[in-house]
Amino acid sequence: MPVRIPDHLPAAEVLESENIFVMSETRAANQDIRPMKVLILNLMPNKIETETQLLRLLGNTPLQVDVDLLRIHDKESKHTSIDHMNTFYRDFEAVRHKNYDGLIITGAPLGQIDFEDVVYWDHIREIIDWSQEHVTSVLFLCWAAHAGLYHLYGLNRKILQQKRSGVFVHRRTSQHFPLLRGFDDEFFAPHSRFAEMDVEEIRQHPQLQLLAESDEAGAYLVLSRNNRNLFVMGHPEYQKSTLNEEYQRDLSQGLDPNVPQNYYRNDDPKDDAIARWHSHGSLLVSNWLNYYVYQLTPYDLSDMTAMTPWESR
């Protein structure tokens, strides 16, 4: 949250140059505060586990957040009961007339399938297109990040020969984005995917900014220049056991998966896993919710044209 300071305080310029979030008394006095309304499109097989992971991160911020859960209406969930889906999830038709402060689109186990061949691809495209006019900021995770970059910006992904699974070191490519406030120079994040985006294509795209990358895992954080779309190539929401559960599942299916890198102590699946990314995941979601949702969204959600541009912040 911001530090409130007197108007024209000389320290303000220094603090802002250091990427410290300060707010003048005049601006603070004119702020309206209400709960943030966030929609989650949950595409992961285990709905309840993913709900818990994302709500854990959203609940670690000082903001009050009202959450709606969204499903693809004609896609039956194999791992979650119909009662749960009907009780807690909404179809797109029930929310298309609404506006939201934030939208989170999760990953999905579809890494080797062409986007156009995904059975509910038309629904995904429709929701992404809708979000560009009805949501202040969209957070795309893993598969959804690739899908969003493909649909919105025409970037193609490369299918990997082996699944990329593990916890990798990343570095910031810039010091001055609010999203990166509080980040260490290097930080860990988990990945679990069958594809990657071309880092150079991202760098050269006029509408995109590469904020963090890894020598081993490639592009990690990509932000659209209008600050409306954040693409996260990994899984900062994963709990400690998730990569192990995926590894054991793949083993049981006879897929001969690689051992997740930098995850088990001594890289031995018989040893305990080490969670190195929880603080980063919490800070990432907190910064997104604060700087790219709360600080930009209009108080009256019925008027999305009232979004405050970064230039005036």
UniProtKB/Swiss-Prot annotation:
Residues marked Important for acyl-CoA specificity (site): 111
Record-marked site positions (Important for substrate specificity): 192
Keywords noted in UniProt: Acyltransferase, Amino-acid biosynthesis, Cytoplasm, Methionine biosynthesis, Transferase
GO biological process, one term: L-methionine biosynthetic process from homoserine via O-succinyl-L-homoserine and cystathionine
EC number: 2.3.1.46
Associated pathway: Amino-acid biosynthesis; L-methionine biosynthesis via de novo pathway; O-succinyl-L-homoserine from L-homoserine: step 1/1
This protein's GO CC annotations: cytoplasm
Name of the molecule in the record: Homoserine O-succinyltransferase
Subcellular localization: Cytoplasm
Any one GO molecular-function label of the UniProt entry: homoserine O-acetyltransferase activity
InterPro entries membership: Class_I_gatase-like (IPR029062), HST_MetA (IPR005697), MetA_family (IPR033752)
Reactions it catalyzes: L-homoserine + succinyl-CoA = O-succinyl-L-homoserine + CoA
This protein's encoding gene: metAS
Main location as per UniProt: cytoplasm
Pfam families: HTS (PF04204)
Active site: 142 (acyl-thioester intermediate), 235 (proton acceptor), 237
Domain of life: Bacteria
Similarity comment: family membership: Belongs to the MetA family.
Source organism: Shewanella baltica (strain OS195)
Protein purpose: Transfers a succinyl group from succinyl-CoA to L-homoserine, forming succinyl-L-homoserine.
Binding site for substrate: 163, 192, 249
